[in-house]
């Protein structure tokens, strides 16, 4: 996301460090990463935010942006955002055609074994449908990482990601084909 004009930009002047700064600014204590600020949350629409930190997604049609907003003390503030055109470009770049695979797994001694049970091939994502699904809370955004509380940024960014609920995947793509697995 972009952070210009947000509290994150005020907190961290270096644009390359702002994803880490976001976790430092809004993260929480976690037993899994002692001494660090963790931020492992799902962010949904205002009606279905899916986290306890006050974050939600808002589609700003007039500015043509999708915003991460933070609700605090009965006020809402934009803390990160994407321009429609950037999101659309990335959506088409990442998912011109995508194979979604479901597998069952088991351990056989030290070796993990997988049995592929389902596959679905989707093509041609529909951007305005993506925007509509954000509004409905069907498309969400996961923030996944942790960082040091101060000083040099240390920790791990697991890569933040957009998610679509499986049962709504066929709405997002103009073509969806289930592939039989033997």
Task: List PLM regions with ranges.
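Nucleic-acid endonuclease domains
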Residues: 1, 7-182
